[in-house]
């Protein structure tokens, strides 16, 4: 059936999709083994392939595929993901991830996209609250002489401070080294809220003190500007051309901690 689709399709990868579509509606009891199915396909096709593989499995087939495409990874089904790693002497290991709780599955499905799923393919990750930190940390890496992409480091925007504990759990289950950067949101001019103190304590407990970099009281405070209006743009302008000696110390510390974690893992390219 797939061979017939290959003969009619304009390109091999389009043929792969057409052939699998036909199989998903008619075939059961078959083992499919596919290497790097994402090659030469647009990101939209990656997401569609993931759903197509699910349809095949629901008909009683088994689907095995290798991938370096975050769009093909489903963090809502961690128990279906097997991580293949290689140590410094070339020994390969395969580890199946433990599933996450049902309540968290829904949250992960909502919060993760292909970019966030890159953390599964990373040597290390920096977990940050939002867009401001995500767009400015690469400038800190650059000013210190590093490129996070070259180092295979993912800067993961967690969609808010309250989601950071969930991302910590995902990193731990995937055995991805990580560093957390978050605001304390505790200001001397006002009484600290119990909720903020509890969240800060939860993050510190889950991540560990050595993996946690707290910005006092927030990003604006350590970067030297005030106000929330257009914060990402202002932060970008503030740090885009900063020299090493002008960088905020907490951000430098976060970058150096992440680099140290990343360099403990074997890179997939050099």
Spans of features found by a protein language model:
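Switch/communication elements of ASCE P-loop NTPase nucleotide-binding domains
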Residues: 1-115
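Acidic, divalent-metal-binding catalytic cores of TOPRIM
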Residues: 73, 82-270
């Amino acid at each position: 059936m797939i061979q017939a689709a290959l003969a009619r399709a304009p390109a091999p990868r389009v043929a792969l999709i057409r052939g699998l579509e036909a199989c998903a509606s008619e075939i059961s009891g078959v083992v499919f083994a596919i290497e790097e199915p994402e090659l030469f396909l647009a990101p939209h096709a990656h997401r569609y392939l993931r759903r197509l593989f699910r349809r095949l499995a629901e008909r009683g087939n088994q689907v095995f595929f290798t991938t370096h495409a975050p769009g093909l990874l489903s963090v809502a089904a961690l128990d279906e993901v097997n991580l293949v790693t290689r140590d410094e002497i070339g020994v390969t290991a395969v580890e199946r991830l433990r599933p996450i709780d049902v309540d968290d599955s829904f949250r992960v499905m909502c919060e993760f996209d292909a970019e966030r799923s890159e953390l599964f393919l990373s040597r290390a990750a920096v977990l940050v609250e939002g867009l401001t930190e995500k767009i400015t940390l690469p400038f800190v890496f650059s000013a210190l002489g590093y490129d996070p992409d070259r180092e295979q480091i993912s800067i993961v925007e967690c969609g808010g401070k309250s989601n950071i504990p969930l991302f910590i759990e995902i990193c731990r289950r995937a055995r991805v080294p990580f560093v957390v950067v978050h605001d304390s949101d505790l200001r001397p001019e006002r009484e600290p809220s119990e909720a903020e103190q509890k969240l800060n304590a939860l993050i510190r407990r889950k991540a560990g003190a050595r993996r946690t970099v707290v910005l006092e009281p927030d990003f604006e405070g350590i970067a030297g500007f005030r106000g929330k209006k257009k914060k990402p743009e202002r932060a970008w302008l503030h740090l885009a051309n900063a020299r090493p000696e002008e960088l905020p110390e907490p951000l430098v510390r976060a970058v150096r901690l992440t680099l140290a974690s990343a360099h403990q893992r074997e890179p997939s390219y050099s």
